[in-house]
Amino acid sequence: MSEIEKKLATLSNGPGVYLMKDESGEIIYVGKARSLKKRVSSYFLEKPNRDLKTGILVKKIASFDAILVTTEKEALILEANLIRKHKPRYNILLKDGKRFPSLRIDVRTSYPRLEVVRKVKKDGAIYFGPFSSAGKLRSTLKIINKTFQLRKCKQKEPPKRNRPCLNYQMGQCLGPCCLPVDRDEYLDMVNEVILFLKGRTNDLLQKIKEQMAAASERQEYELAARLRDRMFAIQATVEKQAAVTTDFVDRDVIGIDREPEGSAISVLYIRGGFLLGSRNYNFDEVLGTDSESIQAFLRQYYDKDRFIPDEVFVPCQLENMELMEQWLTETAEKRVVLHWPQRGEKTRLIEMANENAHEALKDRISSENVFKSLLERLQKRLRMDRPPRRIECFDISHTGGNQTVASMIVFEDGKEAKSEYRTFNIDSLDHPDDYAAMHEVMARRFSPDKDWPTPDVLLIDGGKGQLSITASVLDGLGVMGAFEVISIAKKDEAKKETMDKIYRPGQANPVVFGRDGDVLLFLQRVRDEAHRFAITTHRKKRAKTIRKSALDSVPGIGEKRKKALLRHFGSIKRLKEASPEDIAQVPGISVKRAQEILEALDA
């Protein structure tokens, strides 16, 4: 009897969690079961209709562990915690990507305002969203700003001002910061905004009509005209929208599609009967049925800081439907309905979500095939043993040699891997020296104490000189030859060159790409991304320096002049070395003020 058979014989029939391991002892799958014995044993029984990926997984299982718990709810929670901890290859794993924005309004403040947030908190405020694109969010805010006159200032309560801001002059704010604005009237307008964002436009239009009629009876014709304009603006907006349901319920609709190459899950955001947007999630190798995949997805997707609507539609019957509904209700701290529609108009929503997932998966597979071909041709041009999976690119950015920052960006399988991006602050230089900066960066990147993945290709932004210094440093570190090192130099238009050039160490002539021009374009894209990231990081560092500099102690120098001085001289050190006449060249600075600046800096 094998070790697995011995373990199967001792398994309990109670609920629990099981961890499948490969020959190296790595956990490759975590699952939960109502009956551990039945579920785990099913993996090792021959089944003619077995899922393809299940068959692949079973061949890789060398051992397993099982954890017995008291209830199915405990198993559900433990499974999610173990998946989060071990990140098994064959489980659904949601990456911590940037969340879609939502709108937040806190009606407990004196004069509530709308703000854009990416985290939904249980703080008593009202949230609307998520908005699947910044464009849709901006369009919604534009309509609200034109139609309603909510304040825009960022403080929790309106700041005290002597005169109203530009928004008041444009008719887009009532000016509660300095004008006597009736709070009850303002809150009426806030409630109208809430009705608008909930999609209850019929109720809103009826309310505005009643207010308009009442204002006319009181002979408040200016107010009646404003209400009329607001009503027309809302009607024009509603005409452009198409409702997907006849009720006003907020719901998320989940769809799924699976192929041998991977799977995709799509979420449709329906708010107040209108489709607000959608988001697709792609996964590589995933084990289990649609039910298991959807259940694992829900546990991670709604785990924290996420708006949970009143209803969640799923495309199939889940094994633990009641348990999942209970968990959603407890997490949301309100009643949440988990439903599998099987008839009527609601099944059309599931079809839409499934089709969305299908298109997302099809696009992803097509994209992967394109990148696979591209990387295979790059392998051929660089004469490598295998296609490069991980490409790292470095770039240097500075202001006259000061505040030098080096960026490292990573592409994996042809796509940006932003979680792998790194920055290096080069504080040892106070003058322009890209070679010295690159020397320090390479020494730090490939230092023995850095337990980072080894790249297949290291791409340097620069010509033969940059490549030579990089190769020299790598050779000194003992890593030269462990991966391919190349540099990308811009075309020399004076020599009538038509494309950028790729150089390899020890070769005078650039690599010839011939018909593989798209491979060169890909490397240019990698270089441009490194350049973008370096500049963005450098700007942040420079802004931080501007905020906290020796100039803060100089009387009469505000933020605007401080920026102008640092932009002109590049650093405090160079400013100190300048003459009063040189400093007076900066707009807004007189010779007398320049002398005061130098005296303050020397103090």
Swiss-Prot record:
Q: Which InterPro entries match?
A: GIY-YIG_endonuc, GIY-YIG_endonuc_sf, GIY-YIG_UvrC_Cho, Hlx-hairpin-Hlx_DNA-bd_motif, RuvA_2-like, UVR_dom, UVR_dom_sf, UvrABC_protein_C
GO terms, molecular function: DNA binding; excinuclease ABC activity
Limits of the GIY-YIG domain: 13-92
SMART domains assigned to the protein according to its UniProt record, in alphabetical order: GIYc (SM00465), HhH1 (SM00278)
Provide GO CC annotations from the record: cytoplasm; excinuclease repair complex
Compartment list: Cytoplasm
Q: Which CDD domains match?
A: GIY-YIG_UvrC_Cho
**Key words of the record:** Cytoplasm, DNA damage, DNA excision, DNA repair, Excision nuclease, SOS response
Q: What is this protein called?
A: UvrABC system protein C
Q: Which organism does this sequence originate in?
A: Desulfatibacillum aliphaticivorans
State which gene encodes it.
Answer: uvrC
